[in-house]
Amino acid sequence: MAETEGFGDSGSKQLFAGLSNVSISGDIPVEGEITVPMASTSQEDDLSTLDEPVKDTIMRDLKAVGNKFLHVMYPKKSTTLLRDWDLWGPLVLCVSLALMLQGGNADSKDDGGPQFAEVFVIIWFGAVVITLNSKLLGGTISFFQSLCVLGYCILPLTVAMLVCRLVLLLSHTTASFIVRLVVVTVMFAWSTFASTAFLADSQPPNRRALAVYPIFLFYFVISWMVLTFNTVS
Amino acid sequence: MANSSGSSRNLTAADWGGFDDNMQAGAGAAVIDMENMDDTSGSSFEDMGEIHQRLKEEEEEGEGAPEEGEEDGAFLGMKGVKGQLGRQVADEMWQAGKRQASKAFNLYANIDILRPYFDVEPIQVRNRLLESMIPVKMISFPQKIAGELYGPLMLVFTMVAILLHGMKSSGTIIREGTLMGTAIGTCFGYWLGVSSFIYFVAYLCNAQITMLQTLSLLGYGLFGHCIVLFITYNIHFHSLFYIFWLCIGGLSTLRMVAVLLSRTVGHTQRLILCGTMAALHMLFLLYLHFAYHKVVEGILDTLDGQHIPGPIQRVARDLPLVPNAVLNATAQILLAQSR
């Protein structure tokens, strides 16, 4: 070993001996950063968030959430929702839906209206059950990715709830019920379609129907709660 | 020299032990006692000073050192044990937490164990749903039962949704708990509870059936319940319900009874097993329909409406009677004693 090392040393000395008297002309830059230009892409910029203003951080997260909302509204075959999941959007949607469903009968105690906790539990428990079911059927999607998609796809139903409350403010007639029925049905179809578009690819093709049924049931229950919501007249 | 260094190590250990003790006392109070903390820090600084002095003394006079060292060792041994106890408790807590977390993780990782029971095609599920309504009149040869849980589980969840709908539309009020919890509890309770019970009875009656098959059989039997409840919660005719109860509920019950018959030997055993199954299944449908229906709504209203004058007021009238009765009783006892 020592011999070979010695040989290597002497060999390198011999190799670089010729370079010692090579002169480099002044116009060729020989100094610079020792970073590979390909590596310094967006990834590294994203990581260095220590010294950026708090506003930037919050705005970036908000933008990510808003971007996902857009994806739900225009359900294309995209993997943005799946790639970097977060649970902020689902939380906001779930809480706002539960608050809106709660609001109408907060003053009267004993009507069977949906309670905040009930809506909250239905959404999260249902999402977990759907996810476990898709895992059991052999789906190739991670737990939180599925939760994220299912949570974001409540967005149409939250919008439907908003519309329903506005309609209920105006009138309590049969016509208003028909309007609500149409809105909720459309938004229910939208939710199911959007979540299916994102999640169906992760399922084996022959079992897609089995994975879609619980999703359908889940959104059906929520949309039914939205439809039957009635402010105390 | 070696001795002195050993004792110094002991002393430092003592210091740590004492500190640990004090920390434990502080932690027990759940509020950080500032006085206590101050005491600790003060004493520890004093100790440090003492240690320094002692070390110097030990270096100066080598003979007195072993005695003192032994004493210290004995004294510090106690404190060291206490500190170690605390550390051990903390260690055990940590271990328990770790075990819990790993158990939860294992449960998630072991999801593969359950996967065979969910290995179905949509067409198979559809066929099994239809077959659950068609009784097969073949009792000489054991009928096949699919050991699968996807269909039953989805049927139970569907029934939860239908029950929720029924509760809402009938205006059912549940005092303690939510509608959701009641619906889930009822459906899963029936499915798991009755399956276990039937399995137990089947074991007693020597029927050839496994727990998985019982779960699957009863689960698919709920398909008829789902249809009947969904229709009759929306269309309120009692005659319609009774017809559906007998036809659809009866068909799904007959199917299960036929399967059980084909897997049991002996008339008494067959009668016991199938009678239990049929009674439970049909009565459950009856219960679900009438428990969350408009008929009961009326009863609930009378029970809840305390502002309505009626039998409820009797409670208020009864209340003053109780002390009277007690007074009468005590008066009589006193009289009897005085005699």
UniProtKB/Swiss-Prot annotation, chain A:
What residue ranges lie in the Lumenal compartment?
106-111, 164-180, 230-233
Q: How does it sit in the membrane?
A: Multi-pass membrane protein
Query: Biological process GO annotation list?
Result: endoplasmic reticulum to Golgi vesicle-mediated transport
In terms of InterPro entries, this protein maps to: Yip1/4-like, Yip1_dom
Q: Name one GO cellular component term.
A: Golgi trans cisterna
Residue ranges, Cytoplasmic side: 1-84, 133-142, 202-208
The family annotation for this protein states: Belongs to the YIP1 family.
Please identify the protein, giving its name as recorded. Protein YIPF6
